[in-house]
Regions:
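N-terminal leader/targeting segments and the immediate start of mature chains
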Residues: 6-56, 69, 186
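Gly/Pro-enriched, hydrophobic low-complexity segments
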Residues: 63, 124-187
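C-terminal low-complexity, charged extensions that often adopt amphipathic alpha-helices
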Residues: 98-137, 148-149
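Sec-dependent signal peptide recognition
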Residues: 1-4
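Short, exposed beta-strand/loop patches in secreted or surface proteins that constitute
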Residues: 23-24, 50-55, 75-76, 123-131, ...
């Protein structure tokens, strides 16, 4: 739906932005972010907040900060797009908690977005503006089993920092991610 709205509002395309973004994310060593994730599956909607640290050379780590019922659960993600996920709360560790649909759960959605930005050519890109901020929007589409997975990612045009992302399965939005803070560690 957002793609259709972008096309109807006459937003211009930017053919080079996808490759520029890939180069940028291939060269950063890491970042830290605070994100809000809205998970919408079937008739159930739940909001999560988490602190996420991406480390190109090691494992990514996150800690859920909300809602209170799961606050303090932490996790680590190691590898690439076929990563392993471990969850931990106090002394209890659940190793290899790999989701059935990698990149489509609140625990590994940020990781899935980073993998797309870093490793995958965007299927299309265009420019938008929100609240006076110029944004680059990237659209990724892939097949996973018998379903189509799509990711839309909005980045600030001036520094390529992620602002927002939406993840779809077979045309239905299942996750939205709002980056509330973001700080790169360097290249």
């Amino acid at each position: 739906m957002l793609l259709l709205a972008a096309l109807l509002c006459g937003c211009g395309t930017d053919e080079n932005s996808g490759e520029d973004v890939r180069a940028h994310y291939e060269n950063i060593s890491g970042f830290s972010a605070h994100v809000k994730i809205l998970s919408e599956t079937n008739d159930f909607t739940m909001a999560f907040e988490l602190d996420y640290a991406y480390n190109k050379e090691d494992v990514d780590v996150f800690t859920i900060t909300g809602p209170e019922s799961v606050s303090g659960v932490s996790g680590s993600i190691a590898g690439d797009s076929e990563a392993t996920l471990a969850l931990q709360y106090d002394d209890l560790v659940l190793d290899d908690a790999r989701p059935v649909r990698p990149g489509m759960t609140p625990a590994d959605a940020v990781f899935g977005v980073v993998c797309a930005l870093r490793d995958t050519p965007a299927d299309e890109s265009w420019r938008e503006s929100a609240d006076g901020t110029a944004l680059t929007v990237l659209h990724y589409r892939s097949e996973s089993g018998d379903e189509t997975i799509e990711k839309l990612v909005w980045l600030r045009e001036d520094n390529m920092q992620p602002v927002y992302a939406e993840l779809f399965a077979d045309g239905t939005r299942e996750l939205s991610i709002r980056f509330k803070s973001y700080q790169e560690n360097g290249g």
